[in-house]
Each structure stands twice: as structure tokens, then as C-alpha cells.
């Protein structure tokens, strides 16, 4: 798990062991005091906050000052978990993001030893099976396949994969004239449905290419910058140059200059810019099978939330960028984007039963729905995202057939979303030999603590054996991985990233992951999305405000009627509102928000609470949602919150939701996102884009989106009293100084403009697709060895596990 090679990792681990050994002689009493307290906890696993609590309890504050910067403090503060099996304590230590070390301490004998990853995982497994049997266990290790592959070594390089890749491979590939031939071949291979682009058969060598480019340059010097390509098309064909260089003389000249500069003195940023200007992506397929995927009346249905919004906004921005690039390249090609999702015959008033649906606000983007099927025919009912695994292989074959018919071509890029979409994208890209991009949105392993170690307890309901295996396969197969934040990859100083948690873990009785993913891998790229600016815009833009919706919004918030759309009534309708909107599930933690509000009488004096989640009109079939529904009612009754809270059913009208955010801005309220973990935080972006001061979880993406105290606030969902105190402090300060609310509102808007817009996103995604497509063509970046290993894992492990997931019983009611 070292930073570069196994040898360096061992050196570092050994030095850590020596430092602990030195501390034993220098601070024996303190070490004994701390580790004895840990061992006295008995067999089990301790989390970081528990380890630090025991350290603080064992060592008086004055003595702790003397231990600052000691090996003991470094180890305890860097420990992400402690496995206690008396008299042993094993520690997983994380000196910095992406770098791990493992130690085991015998508290009776005060002995310290380093552990390899398999040794640590084997020790950890004793918490489950209680034995130390050395029976052969399947170990998954992807590191040998990447041993000769370039990777950065600094944590700050994580998520900037394309820059590193260009830098490294440019120097390796373009070191002399002969090494430039792959670039020539790449340009010669460019075509679309039989139409030759960039170069024709007249150019067969680098000398011929450079000669043609210089002649073209000379020709362009004699015509005006705005001369259309069509006017010198025939001359260029004679030189061996085809369409794709640009739509006018000026743009063609710029592209030719870029290539000439590359041929003479390769430079990474110039290479990236050149690859971003040439035609490469015309047909894109986006996979998102689960849930109810449609453009209206679905948000709030089970498994249907931010991912749907993300993809619909994504494709609008992508189509605009593709059309712009194709025009600038001087081509007359119609791009196509297909969002492939599941067709639901039991569509419940949505368009989910419609095979093909055009995406509003686009010209060439459609939702293509393909049903799940078994040997008994089409599956009609909605299926939880945790139960889709038996259907996906057949689904992939059906999707391949459908997209071939729709596109009449092979896609240039396949993008997967979430675990099921990523697995289908992986199988499809593998089958078609297409560039494959993965977007996780959320990796469930990080949302459910210890769901790997105790996977058997979760298996009947969640089937994590299938899901975690699918995640491993997809992330290792992908040509590039897009994340919204650094946190998603490698967390921060205190918390472990989603992908980082897949570096090493164990599922006792199934397999042991010795090296699952490398967060330093240059396939990782941070590309942050935004909000749809036509819907979400600042509350201060009065000319765009949808004031015609205010009566509806006031009815929603303040009417004294309780019905299937809203429960409970607000007494004081003048108070500011704390607002939250999310799916009603355990991880989104809206019940936690209600509880922290209920436990703080001062907060109730200052503000009302409005939560939007669930559906009062229909009983959910989702077990987790049912449990949270019941818990919400119990909390409202327990804390006597009627009069202070409004519980509104999930709202599917995004346009009205945008004005709802702005209406709450008018009331000088705030948005709170209290999730136990949030991969990104699209509602955080939406609220901030409207100018609503935002308080969001410190766990996951929002910690990166928000600069604490400047553009919003971080809250710890595990420390309700501190979170509610922060809210009280904010609203009291706003009462004293109304400009404080404005200051935080403007700070949020500025943050969005700088980093979180769909235009920036689409430009970056198209460039990444071109760059990785190029490197895949000219090098061994397609990682054939890894993919053969993945085929074996899929065939021998995943397929068998998928058969254990029960198929849907069609006779049951299929409602949400």
C-alpha cells in the first residue's frame, strides 16, 4: 500500500515500527496506559474518535503536551481503526491520503511488529470467525498489473490524472522522430461512418506530414482568417489533409500550428490542447439502469434522485459542447447521446414505459429504455438498486443490440453511473472496445460502516457481495474515472475517501482485497458538475424570478391544511426557515436533522423547519424508507414539533423547487444537508447557486464545495448538539447584523461561479475523452492484462453470486 514501490513501503513501515519501539523506552508508562485502555475494551473494532477518546482519558492534558509530535501521538491520530483481540491491538495507520501502514502491538509483552496488508486483513477477520485458520483464501491484488505503469507519488496529484499522464507519456512517447509514428497512425485512422478525417492516404510518413502542414500553412497565409474551409477543401485534399482541422482559415491555422509545435518540441499542455481540438467524440452512451429515470414526476421515487438530475443536466451541457466542437472542426456530423435506462412496463404515471424519449432542451439526445428480462419474459415491476444483479448480463446484450440499431455506429464513449450502470458500461465497453468512463456517484461500502467485514449480516437485504465485486470490476476496467471532488477519491486528512476505502478490505468467506484500487492511478480526474442555471439562479435576479409560483409555494409551506402533500402546520409564519430536501433514507439523515432541531429549544424559537422527503400519499415498498418514515413521525411526536415543522412530500417539479430555494432566501433562511455521508451534494450546489446559505455534512463532497465560514458551514451529523449550536449562532448573528446573511449568501455564489458550472464540466469531459482515447490507441493503456484478470473475477465469482439474488416475483404489487 506504499506510495511508489513495495520496497519503499516496507522501509517506511519499518521506520514507523522503530519509532514506536523508541517511544516504548521513552514513554513506557504512557504507552501502557493508552494501549491497556484499548485492550480493556475487549475484542472488537475501535473507530478514530474512540481511539482518541481513550488516549485523552488515559493521559492527562499536561502530559499530552509532552507527547506532541511523538511517534505515539502520530500513530494514534493517524489510526483509522484499531482491531482489538487481547492481548493484541492491530492498527491501520494513514499518515496521509492514499498512504497506509499496518502495525500490531502485543500489550502484554510491549512488542511491535509491522504487518503486510494480507496479515492485517487476516487478523481483522478474527472478529468475524474467531479463528486463525490459514486455509487458502482468495486474494484479489491488482497491483502487479500496474507495477510498470506510471503513477504520481504526491497526494496533491490525486485527481489530476490527465495532466500527469500527458507529462509522463509525452516524454516517453515523443523522445525522437520514430516515436512520433503512433501519433501519425492515430490521425490516419480517423474516420466516421466511412468518411475520412484529418489525413488521407497521400500522407504515409512523418516527413510527408510535416511537408503537407508547411504547404498548408503557406496557403493559409494568403487568404483571410474567416475564409470557410469549403473554399480551400480541394487544395487541402491534394496535400493529404481532410476535414476536421477547423471550419475557417484561422481555426485551421491554429490547429496546424499546434501539431507542428508538437512534432518539433512535444509539450504536455500543447498535446492536451491539440487532442481537444480534433474530432473524436460523436456518439455517447450513458448507462443508468436503476430507479425511475424520466424527465418529470419521478424525483422522490425509490432510487430516484440526484443521479437523474445530474445526468439530465450533464447531457444538455455535453450536447452543446459536442455541437460547438463539431462546428469548429468544420464537420457536418450530427452527434447522438443516448441515456440508456431500464424500461418499466409498470410505469405508475411516468414515461418510464416509453422506449424512446427526447430530452427536453436538446436536439440529438434521447432516453433509450430497455427492459430487464428473464427466460419468463419482461420484468414489469420496479426493482430496488440492491436487487438488479441477476438481470444485468442479459440486459447488456439487449442494450448492445438496441444502441447499434439507434446509432448505426459504435459509440465513441461509454459512461457508467453508479454500481449497476458501471458494470453494464464495463461489459459493453469490453465487448465493443470503446473508451470507458466510470462515475460512481456513491460507493455503498462507505455509506454502510463495516459492510465489508460483516457483509453476511447485510446480504439478505443489500446483496453487497455482488455490489462490491461489481464496483471493483468497473473501477479497474475504466479508462478514466470522473469524480466530483477530491474527497470522493481520497477523503481528507481525517476521513477516508470512497475509492480509498477500496484499496484494501476483506469480506470473510468470500475474498480478501489486498490491493483493490490505487487512488494515485492517473485514471482519476476531478470534474465537478454544476446546477442547471436556467432553473437555479440567484434570488437577487428579480427579472427572472417566477413570482407566479409564490401562491403555490405559500400554500405548500404555510397552509393550515394537512393532506397527502404536507403534514403538520407552522404557527409563526414569519420566522426564517431551515430547509432540507432529500430522499428519505438512513444515509441522507433527515431524521437526524429533525432530532437535532427537536433537542434545541432555542433553535425552535429562532426558525421553523421544513423538510421535503418521502410521499404521504403512497406507502413505500422500500424497507429503509418505511423505517425512516416511522422514525420521522415518532421524533415529531417525541419533541412536540407540530407548529414548528412542516413535512412536505417529495417535490418533482424542479422549476418550482428552484423558486422554493429563492423564496426561502427571501425569508433569510438556510439550507441544511445533514447526510451521514454525501459523495458530492447536488442539492448543496442548487441551494448555493440560488444564494441560500448552506450548512452541509463534513463527510464527503460538501466539505470540499463549502469553504467553512466563507461560503457556508460544515456540520458533523454525528454531533447533533454542535451542529444545532452552529445554526443558533448563525441565526442569532443574522438577527444582530442582517449583512451577515448577505455575506454568506454572496460567498456561496462566488464559490459556485469559480468551480461548479456545467459549461466547465462539459469542456473538461470532452477533452478527457479525447486524451484517454488517444493514449489508449498509442500505448498499452487499455491494460489488457488487467482486463483478463477481471474477466476471470467476473466469470468465476460475480456470476455465481448474482444467481443467489432472488428474482422479482411478478405477482406482487409493483408500486413505489
UniProtKB/Swiss-Prot annotation:
Coiled coil: none annotated. Pfam families: Glycos_transf_1, GT-B_Sucrose_synth, SUS_EPBD, SUS_N. Gene3D superfamilies: 1.20.120.1230, 3.10.450.330, Glycogen Phosphorylase B (3.40.50.2000). One of its GO terms (molecular function) is sucrose synthase activity. Its EC number is 2.4.1.13. Keywords: Glycosyltransferase, Transferase. The keyword Glycosyltransferase applies. Expressed in parenchymatous tissues, aleurone layers and cell surrounding the vascular tissue in seeds (at protein level). Predominantly expressed in caryopses. The keyword Oxidoreductase does not apply. One of its GO terms (biological process) is sucrose metabolic process. It catalyses: an NDP-alpha-D-glucose + D-fructose = a ribonucleoside 5'-diphosphate + sucrose + H(+). InterPro entries: Glyco_trans_1, Sucrose_synth_GT-B1, Sucrose_synthase_pln/cyn, SUS_EPBD, SUS_N. Residues 280-757 are annotated as: GT-B glycosyltransferase. Belongs to the glycosyltransferase 1 family. Plant sucrose synthase subfamily. Sucrose-cleaving enzyme that provides UDP-glucose and fructose for various metabolic pathways. This is Sucrose synthase 3.
Amino acid at each position: 500500500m506504499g506510495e511508489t514501490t513495495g520496497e519503499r513501503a516496507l522501509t517506511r513501515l519499518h521506520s514507523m515500527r522503530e519509532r514506536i519501539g523508541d517511544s516504548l523506552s521513552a514513554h513506557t508508562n504512557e504507552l501502557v496506559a493508552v494501549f491497556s485502555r484499548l485492550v480493556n475494551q475487549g475484542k472488537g473494532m475501535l473507530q478514530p474518535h474512540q481511539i482518541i477518546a481513550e488516549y485523552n482519558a488515559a493521559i492527562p492534558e499536561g502530559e499530552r503536551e509532552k507527547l506532541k509530535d511523538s511517534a505515539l501521538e502520530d500513530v494514534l491520530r493517524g489510526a483509522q481503526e484499531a482491531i482489538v483481540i487481547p492481548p493484541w491491538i492491530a492498527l491501520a495507520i494513514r499518515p496521509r491520503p492514499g498512504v497506509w501502514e499496518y502495525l500490531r502491538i502485543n500489550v502484554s509483552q510491549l512488542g511491535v511488529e509491522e504487518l503486510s496488508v494480507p496479515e492485517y486483513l487476516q487478523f481483522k477477520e478474527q472478529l468475524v470467525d474467531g479463528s486463525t485458520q490459514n486455509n487458502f483464501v482468495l486474494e484479489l491484488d491488482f497491483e502487479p498489473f500496474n507495477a510498470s505503469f506510471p503513477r504520481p507519488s504526491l497526494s496533491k496529484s490525486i485527481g489530476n490524472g490527465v495532466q500527469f499522464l500527458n507529462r509522463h507519456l509525452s516524454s516517453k512517447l515523443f523522445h525522437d522522430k520514430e516515436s512520433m509514428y503512433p501519433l501519425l497512425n492515430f490521425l490516419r485512422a480517423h474516420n466516421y461512418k466511412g468518411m475520412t478525417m484529418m489525413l488521407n492516404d497521400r500522407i504515409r510518413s512523418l516527413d510527408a506530414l510535416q511537408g503537407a502542414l508547411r504547404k498548408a500553412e503557406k496557403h493559409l497565409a494568403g487568404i483571410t482568417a474567416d475564409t470557410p474551409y469549403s473554399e480551400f477543401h480541394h487544395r487541402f485534399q491534394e496535400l493529404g489533409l481532410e476535414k476536421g482541422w477547423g471550419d475557417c482559415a484561422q481555426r485551421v491555422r491554429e490547429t496546424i500550428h499546434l501539431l507542428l509545435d508538437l512534432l518539433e518540441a512535444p509539450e504536455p499542455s500543447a498535446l492536451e490542447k491539440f487532442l481537444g481540438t480534433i474530432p473524436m467524440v460523436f456518439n455517447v452512451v450513458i448507462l443508468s439502469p436503476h430507479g425511475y429515470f424520466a424527465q418529470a414526476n419521478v424525483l422522490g421515487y425509490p432510487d430516484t434522485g440526484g443521479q437523474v438530475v445530474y445526468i439530465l443536466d450533464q447531457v444538455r451541457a455535453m450536447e452543446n459542447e459536442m455541437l460547438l466542437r463539431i462546428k469548429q472542426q468544420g464537420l457536418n456530423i450530427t452527434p447522438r447521446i443516448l441515456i440508456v435506462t431500464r424500461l418499466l412496463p409498470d410505469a405508475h404515471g411516468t414515461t418510464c414505459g416509453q422506449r424512446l424519449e427526447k430530452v427536453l432542451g436538446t436536439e440529438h439526445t434521447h432516453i433509450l429504455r430497455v427492459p430487464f428480462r428473464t427466460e419468463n419474459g419482461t420484468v414489469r415491476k420496479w426493482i430496488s438498486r440492491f436487487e438488479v444483479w441477476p438481470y444485468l448480463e442479459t440486459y447488456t446484450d439487449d442494450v448492445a443490440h438496441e444502441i447499434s440499431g439507434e446509432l448505426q455506429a459504435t459509440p465513441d464513449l461509454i459512461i457508467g453511473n453508479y454500481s449497476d450502470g458501471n458494470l453494464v458500461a464495463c461489459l459493453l465497453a469490453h465487448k465493443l472496445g470503446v473508451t470507458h468512463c466510470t462515475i460512481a456517484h456513491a460507493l455503498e461500502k462507505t455509506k454502510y460502516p463495516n459492510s465489508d467485514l460483516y457483509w453476511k449480516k447485510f446480504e439478505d437485504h443489500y446483496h453487497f457481495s455482488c455490489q462490491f465485486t461489481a464496483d471493483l470490476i468497473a473501477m479497474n476496467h475504466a479508462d478514466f474515472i470522473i469524480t466530483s471532488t477530491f474527497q470522493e477519491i481520497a477523503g481528507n486528512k481525517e476521513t477516508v475517501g470512497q475509492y480509498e476505502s477500496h484499496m484494501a478490505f476483506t469480506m470473510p468467506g468470500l475474498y480478501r482485497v489486498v490491493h483493490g484500487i490505487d487512488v494515485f492511478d492517473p485514471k482519476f480526474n476531478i470534474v465537478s458538475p454544476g446546477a442547471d442555471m436556467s432553473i437555479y439562479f440567484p434570488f437577487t435576479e428579480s427579472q427572472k424570478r417566477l413570482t407566479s409560483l409564490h401562491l403555490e409555494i405559500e400554500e405548500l409551506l404555510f397552509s393550515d391544511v394537512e393532506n397527502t402533500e404536507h403534514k403538520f402546520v407552522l404557527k409563526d409564519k414569519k420566522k426564517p426557515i431551515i430547509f432540507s430536501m432529500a430522499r428519505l433514507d438512513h444515509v441522507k439523515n433527515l431524521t437526524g436533522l429533525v432530532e437535532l432541531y427537536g433537542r434545541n429549544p432555542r433553535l425552535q424559537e429562532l426558525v421553523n423547519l421544513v423538510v421535503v422527503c418521502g410521499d404521504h400519499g403512497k406507502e413505500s415498498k422500500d424497507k429503509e424508507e418505511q423505517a425512516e418514515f416511522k422514525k420521522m413521525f415518532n421524533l415529531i411526536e417525541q419533541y412536540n414539533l407540530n407548529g414548528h415543522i412542516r413535512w412536505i412530500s417529495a417535490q418533482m417539479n424542479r422549476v418550482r423547487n428552484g423558486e422554493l430555494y429563492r423564496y426561502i432566501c427571501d425569508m433569510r433562511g438556510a439550507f441544511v444537508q445533514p447526510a451521514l455521508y454525501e459523495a458530492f451534494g447536488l442539492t448543496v450546489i442548487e441551494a448555493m447557486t440560488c444564494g441560500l446559505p448552506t450548512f452541509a455534512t463534513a463527510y464527503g463532497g460538501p466539505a470540499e464545495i463549502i469553504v467553512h465560514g466563507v461560503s457556508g458551514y460544515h456540520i458533523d451529523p454525528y454531533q447533533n448538539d454542535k451542529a444545532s449550536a452552529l445554526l443558533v449562532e448563525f441565526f442569532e448573528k443574522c438577527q444582530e447584523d442582517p449583512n451577515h446573511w448577505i455575506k454568506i449568501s454572496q460567498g456561496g455564489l462566488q464559490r459556485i461561479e469559480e468551480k461548479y458550472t456545467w459549461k466547465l464540466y462539459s469542456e473538461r469531459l470532452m477533452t478527457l475523452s479525447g486524451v484517454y482515447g488517444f493514449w489508449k490507441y498509442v500505448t498499452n493503456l487499455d491494460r489488457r492484462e488487467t482486463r483478463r484478470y477481471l474477466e476471470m473475477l467476473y466469470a468465476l465469482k460475480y456470476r455465481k453470486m448474482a444467481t443467489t439474488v432472488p428474482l422479482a416475483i411478478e405477482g406482487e404489487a409493483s408500486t413505489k
